[in-house]
């Protein structure tokens, strides 16, 4: 028997090195002067002193997230340049809920067989998203795992770190009945509900990713691949105008029904007014194809609202004014006395 090597077992070290060569310039372009290490280090060094000088009592906020089975849509289309945007946006939005400014990002890309060009495409999306919001992509990991992942599939995970002034942490504790619920529009499914959406379109509907449906402007695949909106600029535009946001909810898995209660204090519920914002065509199409009940749609998908602000009724106009030209703002409901839950009316 001749000599064997690692590559014959399914792991190609040279491919990993090639991937690093392809992404290194893009990754470095996200670095600020706070980043003290380059690619290839065992860890990432980030100088906190210049950051901490801007805070009286800094609190670090971290979150970890993935993009779920949206990667399957990317694989079917052979288009991987937006799922990196999804990864950064999903993680960043989760810490924005507390008023934290995202600073650094780490990524993990796993697959059955490492293809450097695909890794480059995925990371290019992260780089784009990081540069748009001032986040440094300080490190990452690629894992080639034969026999673990199906051929051609990828798993993406991102870890984000941010900072917030302790006195300015948005906790939701000051929310009270009479406050107004504002919705910021999504542009699609974002990164949640893809197993359900794939079942509806591909199993029940019998569609292919390249098929066109009259009510959708793009093909099924491109509609589903629409990148997750990053709300960093939205949140800080409002906060920098010294408008008091009492609570923020990132509308992810569980939709409005499951996510808004996560930021409500005891004794407060929310009534959502159906029809108070435009539901995107993709959701209406899925509901029709799958004959899905309304409540299930609102629990599985964001239904066209990607982030929710809860504010005093007197601040509604100020929020709309601050975000004019950046996003539409819809008054979608109100805070009421009662159980910590969301009701649709």
Where are these regions (language model features)?
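Residue-level detector of flexible, active-site-proximal loop/helix-junction positions
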Residues: 20, 52, 68, 144, ...
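Glycine-rich beta-alpha junction loops
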Residues: 43, 162-164, 186-190, 198-201, ...
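N-terminal amphipathic/basic leader segments beginning at the initiator methionine
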Residues: 2-34
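Glycine-/charge-enriched secondary-structure boundary and capping motifs
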Residues: 2-8, 25, 118, 122-136, ...
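Acidic, glycine-rich loop-and-beta core segments that form the ion-binding/anion-interacting portion
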Residues: 177-218, 222
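Glycine-rich phosphate/pyrophosphate-binding loop regions near the starts of catalytic domains
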Residues: 31-187
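Residue-level signature of catalytic and energy-coupling elements of molecular machines
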Residues: 12, 65, 178, 250, ...
């Amino acid at each position: 028997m001749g000599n064997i090597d690692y590559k014959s077992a399914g792991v190609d070290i040279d491919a990993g090195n090639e991937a690093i060569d392809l992404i290194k310039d893009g990754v470095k372009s996200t670095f600020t002067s706070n980043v003290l290490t380059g690619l290839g280090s065992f860890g990432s060094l980030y100088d906190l002193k210049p950051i901490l000088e801007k805070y009286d009592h800094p609190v670090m906020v971290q979150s970890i997230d993935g993009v779920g089975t949206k990667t399957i849509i990317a694989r079917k289309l052979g288009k991987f340049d937006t799922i990196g945007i999804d990864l950064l946006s999903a993680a960043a939005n989760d810490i924005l809920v507390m008023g934290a400014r995202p600073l650094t990002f780490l990524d993990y890309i796993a697959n059955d067989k490492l293809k450097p060009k695909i890794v480059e495409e995925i990371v290019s999306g992260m780089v784009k998203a990081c540069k748009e919001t001032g986040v440094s992509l300080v490190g990452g990991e690629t894992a080639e795992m034969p026999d673990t992942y199906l051929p051609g599939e990828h798993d993406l995970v991102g870890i984000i770190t941010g900072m917030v002034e302790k006195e300015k942490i948005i906790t939701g504790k000051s929310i009270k009945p009479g406050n107004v619920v504002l919705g910021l529009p999504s542009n699609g499914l974002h990164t949640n509900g893809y197993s359900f959406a794939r079942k509806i379109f591909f199993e029940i509907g019998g569609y292919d990713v390249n098929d066109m449906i009259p009510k959708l402007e793009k093909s099924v695949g491109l509609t589903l691949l629409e990148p997750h909106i990053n709300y960093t600029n939205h949140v800080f535009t409002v906060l920098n105008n010294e408008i008091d946001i009492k609570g923020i909810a990132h509308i992810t898995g569980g939709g409005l029904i499951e996510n808004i209660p996560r930021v409500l204090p005891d004794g407060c519920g929310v009534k959502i007014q159906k029809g108070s914002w435009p539901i995107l065509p993709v959701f209406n199409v899925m509901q029709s194809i799958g004959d899905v009940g309304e409540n299930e749609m609102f629990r599985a998908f964001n239904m066209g609202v990607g982030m929710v602000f809860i504010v005093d009724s007197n601040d509604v106009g100020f929020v709309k004014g601050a975000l004019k030209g950046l996003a539409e703002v819809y008054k979608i409901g109100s805070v009421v006395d009662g159980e910590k839950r969301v009701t649709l009316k």
